[in-house]
Structures are given as structure tokens and as C-alpha cells.
């Protein structure tokens, strides 16, 4: 065997654990779920499974509960995504200052992301927010009472539950802040100085220089936030369980109920692939729009 052949064999050997894991836990289940989406597979009675073709997908088009869950999810995304993008950018601008102890503040802002990412962390965070939203002795209503405002029902209100869960999503704002911060620290100082010498004020420098130069970071955060928002599950499952009155029945929660409450795995698989198609379509639209507002260094604006 030649030296190149041995090197290739060693490379495949090191690659094989990942490849086997990918086939067993990602590609394999995806193929199985795609096949199941064309059947009426029932978990409790797998022997009665029959091929229904596109029946599950046609059923989804006429499902009013699915339409409701999609509206709830899109409303949540419309609130949570802009809030994370704006607050993350504001925090990054503040924490980009050259001041003593700033590294400690940056760590403090990012720490909630690490907690939520730990094993069971997202459930623990959801339980913490359940206390924060508690109408009688929760933190939010206590803060409102300090400024003379009436208490709110928060997640126990059909009107406020989705905005409350969007507020809860800001627990992870440290992730977008960190990406913005990395982009801000790579800004060419000569361009900023040139804008200042030309008489541009702070707002004009931010809008005309800083924001275009960090637009790739904004684009990256937008794509991630959109995908995460469409797949929101833990908050609604732990905090509200879809209530009150299905007002927080997110798409993923409805999918979960079909799979593990009603045991209708065929229909649940179809819902999963429809969500994949929706996420892919929205992501493609964002990528298309990026041509007109994302600036890459060394290229014309929007390319």
C-alpha cells in the first residue's frame, strides 16, 4: 500500500465514528420518518400499518388545529426574532467598550446560554421563568408593583402568553451578542476614523459604517433565530403545555402530541417534513434578500 493510501485509510478510520453516528442517529431516522409520513403507522398497533400515499399531507392542509399552531408559531417568531436581534446588538455595542472588568460582564451575559445548553438546562430555565411569570408572587409582577402598575397574568392570559414566551426567549440573547461582539471587534478602525474625520456623528457612523460592516453577523443571527423560533418546544411544553386554551400551541408541541400522545406517528412524521419544508423556504427567502443588504469585506454591498 502506498503512503497516500495509508493516509487515506487512517483518515477514513478517524472519520468512521462520526459517519456511523450520522447514519444511525440522523440520516437513518430521517429516511424512516419520510417513509412513515406516507403511512398511517400507529405506535400501539404497528401491524395495522397501511400505505396512504399523500393522505397525511392532504390531511394537514385541512387540519384547523395545525393552522392555528402555525399562526401561533409565526406570531412568536415575529416577536422573538427581532427582539433577540436588537437586544443582542445593543448589548454587544455596550460590551464592546474598552473598560476594566468588561470581560466579566460579557461572561455574565453569555452564562445563561451555557446554563440552557447543559443537560436538562432548558427545562430548568423554563421552570425558573414559570416562577418569574407567577401572577401572585412572581418577579415580574413584583417589579410592576414597585412602579405602581397593576399585575398581569402573563402566561396564564390568552392575550399575553405568546409575548411572554417571546420575552422568555431573551434568556439566550448572549449567543447573538457574542456573534455581534466578534464582528464589532474586527471592524477596521481606519474606516471608523475616516468617517469621524468627515464629520459623521455617532448615529451616522453606526448606520452608515458599523451596521453595514457587521451585516454578515446580523444575517447569521437572523437565520439561526428564525430556525430556532420555528422549532420552539420546551418553553410551551414545560411552562404552558399549549395553554391557556391552546393559545400557545406551537407547531412542535402539536407535532409532539400527535406522535407521543395520540401515537399517530405517520401524521406526526408528515408534520415534521412540512415544518422542514417551511423552514427551508423561509431560509431561502432570507438568503435571497441578503443580496441587497449584506456587505462582505472586499465585495460590492449586498454581494
Question: What residue spans do the PLM features occupy?
Answer:
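A structural signal for multi-pass alpha-helical bundles of membrane permease subunits
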Residues: 7-303
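Short, Lys/Arg-rich, polar N-terminal cytosolic tail immediately upstream
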Residues: 1-6
Amino acid at each position: 500500500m502506498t503512503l497516500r493510501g495509508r493516509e487515506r485509510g487512517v483518515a477514513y478510520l478517524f472519520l468512521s465514528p462520526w459517519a456511523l453516528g450520522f447514519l444511525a442517529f440522523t440520516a437513518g431516522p430521517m429516511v424512516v420518518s419520510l417513509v412513515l409520513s406516507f403511512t398511517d403507522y400507529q405506535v400501539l398497533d404497528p401491524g395495522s400499518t397501511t400505505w396512504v400515499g399523500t393522505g397525511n399531507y392532504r390531511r394537514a392542509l385541512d387540519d384547523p388545529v395545525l393552522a392555528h399552531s402555525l399562526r401561533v408559531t409565526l406570531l412568536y417568531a415575529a416577536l422573538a426574532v427581532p427582539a433577540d436581534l436588537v437586544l443582542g446588538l445593543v448589548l454587544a455595542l455596550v460590551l464592546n467598550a474598552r473598560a476594566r472588568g468588561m470581560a466579566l460582564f460579557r461572561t455574565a451575559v453569555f452564562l445563561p446560554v451555557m446554563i440552557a445548553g447543559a443537560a436538562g438546562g432548558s427545562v430548568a430555565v423554563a421552570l425558573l421563568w414559570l416562577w418569574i411569570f407567577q401572577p401572585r408572587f412572581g418577579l415580574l409582577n413584583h417589579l410592576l408593583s414597585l412602579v405602581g402598575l397593576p399585575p398581569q397574568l402573563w402566561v396564564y392570559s390568552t392575550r399575553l402568553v405568546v409575548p411572554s414566551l417571546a420575552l422568555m426567549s431573551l434568556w439566550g440573547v448572549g449567543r447573538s451578542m457574542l456573534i455581534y461582539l466578534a464582528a464589532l471587534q474586527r471592524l477596521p478602525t481606519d474606516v471608523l476614523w475616516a468617517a469621524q474625520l468627515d464629520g459623521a456623528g455617532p448615529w451616522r457612523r453606526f448606520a452608515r459604517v458599523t451596521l453595514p460592516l457587521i451585516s454578515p453577523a446580523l444575517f447569521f443571527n437572523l437565520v439561526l433565530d428564525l430556525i430556532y423560533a420555528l422549532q420552539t418546544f420546551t418553553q410551551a411544553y414545560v411552562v404552558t403545555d399549549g395553554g391557556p386554551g391552546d393559545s400557545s400551541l406551537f407547531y412542535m408541541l402539536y407535532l409532539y402530541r400527535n406522535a407521543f400522545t395520540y401515537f399517530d406517528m405517520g401524521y406526526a412524521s408528515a408534520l415534521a417534513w412540512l415544518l422542514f419544508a417551511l423552514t427551508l423556504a423561509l431560509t431561502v427567502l432570507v438568503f435571497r434578500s441578503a443580496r441587497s443588504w449584506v456587505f462582505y469585506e472586499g465585495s460590492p454591498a449586498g454581494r
